[in-house]
Amino acid sequence: MLTSNEIRKQIDNGTIQIENMAEDALKKPNSCDLRIGNVLYVFDYEIVDTKNCKNYLQEVLNDQISHLRRVVIPETGLLLEPHKVYLTKTVEKVTTNGYVPVMNGKTMLSLLGVSVELTNGYKTDHFDD
């Protein structure tokens, strides 16, 4: 685990790249705060059948993403509905040569019942926002 000072050094020498990083992102002792973007997608299936994941993926690949609803988060914020899955991305783009970044939600979010799931980070044309 790197300290915030070491993260800053690695950014300065180019080993870690963080595009659009906020000025105060490294204020904690051993982390870099990331922000969610202003667009999210709501997964509109009431029940997600894990045996059917290939069909969900096929819909995305065939541009038939009827189960995803695009929502722009207004300046005033957005009230999240319970029992929904929301997909979004960070404002920042993080790349690194030699480190494996770990992303966790803040304790405050966990206390509210919100969990953060990190995916592989591969870019897809379906979610360019």
Describe these PLM feature segments.
Residues 1-129:
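DUTPase catalytic domain/fold
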